[in-house]
């Protein structure tokens, strides 16, 4: 896709959001199946746009707003996502690799059968999100916030840095596999219903200065506490 074509689509989508032209419903941006690699989509309002199976490799989406968007099967490779805002978006079967999500916001989003690999996710917010069979491998997730999120089915945190994170009111952290991670300064000050359940093979895990209250560790083998 050329930059000129992209700008025309974005201009039409702005009319869709403003509802200021006749037949505005047909102006909605649908990028399904397109190659947006290397494109600049930063500082844009792309609410209600569709991005199924889109390639965002090397694209710039910094400080853009995506609400009620479909990212099914989307590919994010070396993508700039700093301070992006995702609200009620579907990331089923999507993949994030070597991408920057520093200070990004994800609220009420669905992450199913997808993966984050070698990403920078420091200070990222995942609030009221649903995770189902998600792999998080070799990521930097320091100072991230996972408040009020739900984990379904096995989710794996592998070889990642998880320092000083917030896990307030997480509902049922079930079937999580944590391997070769450093977990430091977890704070869970609320939620008497939070459950850390069935953590598998916690090799080389270090829990340092953790403040976890009202948690139940069921069928777990937690090692190397300091």
Specify the residue positions occupied by each region the protein language model found.
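Active-site environment of non-heme Fe oxygenases that use a 2-His-1-carboxylate facial triad
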Residues: 13
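Tandem repeat scaffolds
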Residues: 4-8, 18-226
């Amino acid at each position: 896709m050329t930059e000129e074509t992209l700008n025309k689509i974005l201009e039409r989508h702005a009319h869709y959001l403003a509802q200021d032209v006749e037949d505005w419903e047909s102006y909605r941006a649908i990028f399904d199946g397109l190659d947006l690699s290397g494109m600049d989509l930063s500082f844009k309002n792309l609410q209600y746009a569709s991005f199924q199976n889109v390639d965002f490799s090397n694209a710039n989406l910094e400080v853009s707003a995506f609400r009620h968007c479909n990212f099914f099967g989307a590919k994010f490779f070396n993508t700039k996502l700093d301070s992006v805002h995702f609200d009620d978006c579907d990331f089923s079967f999507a993949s994030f690799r070597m991408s920057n999500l520093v200070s990004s916001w994800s609220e009420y989003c669905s992450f199913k059968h997808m993966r984050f690999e070698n990403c920078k996710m420091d200070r990222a917010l995942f609030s009221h999100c649903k995770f189902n069979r998600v792999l998080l491998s070799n990521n930097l997730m320091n100072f991230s916030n996972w408040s009020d999120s739900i984990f379904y089915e096995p989710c794996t945190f592998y070889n990642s840095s998880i320092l000083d994170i917030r896990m307030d009111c997480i509902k049922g952290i079930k079937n999580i596999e944590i391997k070769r991670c450093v977990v430091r300064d977890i704070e869970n000050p609320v939620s008497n219903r939070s459950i850390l359940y069935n953590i598998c093979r916690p090799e080389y895990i270090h829990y340092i200065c953790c403040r976890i209250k009202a948690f139940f560790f069921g069928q777990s083998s937690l090692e190397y506490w300091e």
